Amino acid sequence: MRTLGGFTFPCDAPVFVRVDFNVPMDEVGTITDDLRIRASLPTIESLLGRGAPLILISHLGRPVKNEQQGFSLKPCAERLSEYIGVNVPLVDFLDLDTKLYGELTRHLDKSGIVLFENIRFFAEETSKAQADRRILAEQLAPFAGAYVNDAFGASHRRHASVYELAQAFSNKAAGFLIESEMQAFSHLASEAKRPYTVILGGAKLSDKLRLIENILPTVDRLLLCGGMAFTFLAAQGCETGKSLLEESFIPEANKIIDFAKQNNVELILPVDVIEARSLTSPLGVVSKAESISYMGLDIGPETQSIFRNVIQDSKTVFWNGPAGLFENPSFSNGTRALLDALSSSSAFTFIGGGDTAAAVSLLGFDYGDFSHVSTGGGACLELLEGKILPALEVL
């Protein structure tokens, strides 16, 4: 994979930079967490500093045909303008014709940078038919002379702007964000100091099964929380009440438990939970994990203490998946306790993207409190599952 260190610019031709500005927004379109925009700045500022005219491409959300309201990248263009001190025009390029060349030239002559409107407004971007995606890539390619991918969070997709468009260029590279993400994953894979602890939460075991199978032989401790923990508790004969449970995966949970025992991996499950009658309950009660009557929605204080002690005794910690329903303040204490323990740890602390990264901001922590916070959710998991990311393979 070529990086920006070995990247050469075409004479006078713009450079496509595929960024990931898929940021959360509230109901009025205000960005609530701009981690992904800030993470793109080193690449953008470096290229601008070298005199390269930039055409940024990104997606936002999952717009459906003829429904574009709420999916415009305008707030992202405005936020990026604030960060780099240059007006970043948002260009609506739904008509890919010769008129666009003139519009792009005017904007690039003035600002040196533009942001194309949401690439997913083209149905071909996410089409399952490679021929459709290739058509879009072929329409876009003439507008630039080189291609840089810095959209780590989209690199597990075979979408036109990260896969087929990259294939259209011989002069291409990965941006600094992707480079830093891959360095962090390399650290986990080959340089992790021990004890090496992995914390996995989130809703379903089925979503993390391949990940667990891939990393279990390499770790010293596996801490399980969130909804997925109830499948393991049920496998051990615990009453899980109305908690999220994947009964069909209980045999898989038993296999993981047995493998951990045979390979001296310490597998730690919650010993107490915060349970409530519904997801919107204003208050939960502490219950022992083996006898839950209603819905377990967070780890309890005893489990928080156990997990905290394990983190303090670790040299490397990877965490993906919240400990509970952290969006509800009544069930956020477990996730907050893990963030607090990790932020004060001297270990190499890696926060897997998605909901876990969102919890950092929502619960009042700073991304700089941790060694690495990934900008990728699905991409992060697929790398840890041992998969090759398609968009990086074509770089």
UniProtKB/Swiss-Prot annotation:
InterPro entries: Phosphoglycerate_kinase (IPR001576), Phosphoglycerate_kinase_N (IPR015824), Phosphoglycerate_kinase_sf (IPR036043). ATP binds at K208, G296, E327, G353, G354, D355, T356. Pfam families: PGK. One of its GO terms (cellular component) is cytosol. It catalyses: (2R)-3-phosphoglycerate + ATP = (2R)-3-phospho-glyceroyl phosphate + ADP. Its main location: cytoplasm. It is an enzyme of class 2 (transferase). Pathway: Carbohydrate degradation; glycolysis; pyruvate from D-glyceraldehyde 3-phosphate: step 2/5. Monomer. This is Phosphoglycerate kinase. It comes from Tropheryma whipplei (strain Twist) (Whipple's bacillus).
